Amino acid sequence: MILASQSPRRRQLLEEAGFALKICPADIDEAARPDERPTDLVRRLASEKAEACRQMLSQGPADGLLVAADTIVWSPELGVLGKPTDPDDARRTLAALSGRTHHVSTGVSALLLSPTCEVLGSASFVETTDVTFYELTEAEIDAYVTTGDPMDKAGSYGIQTPAGRLLVKSIHGDYDNVVGLPIPRLMRELSRLTRHSNGILWPLQTLSTAK
């Protein structure tokens, strides 16, 4: 599989699911369009990343699969919360999220490619998970920011890290989606796209034989 992303978290999730990956980072303009809804934004960016990567390829992947994704943290009240520009920005974001529920949406675009990189099929979807934070004190926010954990993450936190998980009171939806890629949904979409005879069991068989 070709992954059109440099995210170490997406790479880890896919490798844990049994995929051998080739990384193809896609450089696109990620600015939102006027009045574009958050879910429409991530769907569009994922599709543009997939196409940008496809255009750079001279040969299709062995399994024919190319996957691109884009994840945002947002709420109707706060808008889209990107990666912090500095520690103070991270503090402001975490204070705004304190005691509230926000959304994490990931747009995914999957292409089935021929050996000459022609598109044989495609799948596009958006997965959204609701995340609720505990009420955070200023001292708790400062302690978390001091770890450096927020600085490369949308929304200024990482649910998968030992420190970041302590901020989260509850989630409703797919945990992997908050990390960066909704693996269970992706597996089902890939099964439909590739029409493997074993359906959703095919990646699980790969995992069982790898142990």
Q: Where in this protein do the model-derived segments appear?
A:
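A short beta-strand-loop structural module common to alpha/beta enzyme folds
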Residues: 22-30
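Cofactor-binding loop segments of dinucleotide-utilizing enzymes, especially the Rossmann-like FAD-
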Residues: 6, 26, 113
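A local structural micro-motif
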Residues: 21-22, 198
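N-terminal beta1-alpha1 ligand-phosphate binding loop
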Residues: 1-19
